Amino acid sequence: MTNSNHKAESISPAGYEQNLACIFCDALISDRSRIVQENELAYATRDAFPVTPLHTLIIPKRHVIDYFGLTTDEVVAMHELTLAQKIIIDALDSTVQAYNIGANCGEIAGQSVWHCHIHMIPRRAGDAPHPKGGVRHVIPWKGRV
């Protein structure tokens, strides 16, 4: 489900559609200090409300609502940043042993920021009492272990 109130409102100097009210579009314009890595089509930033230390968001530069609106080139660019950030995070914190990677697409799935972003959540031994099943437990009583 997309919301028509979240249409692109401007074109940035780089030519990317951006929504001036969007926090992720704003990071490209006025808060670049939060960007830890970028390529032509996407950027990485540490989550402002991290689930675990070094929780990272991979974000397309173009204002697009969710993963299903991405172009193939944007998917590739975001994938490249995800792989690069894994190397960086692993080097920054040797206690990281695994990752959860995912996106919320639509209000019912929990999306609350209407600009596509991929969560990259580093995991460490003992950070959750029963991690078995991972994302299968996004609906707690439905996941099988």
Regions found by a protein language model. Give the residues of each.
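HIT superfamily nucleotide-processing domains
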Residues: 1-145
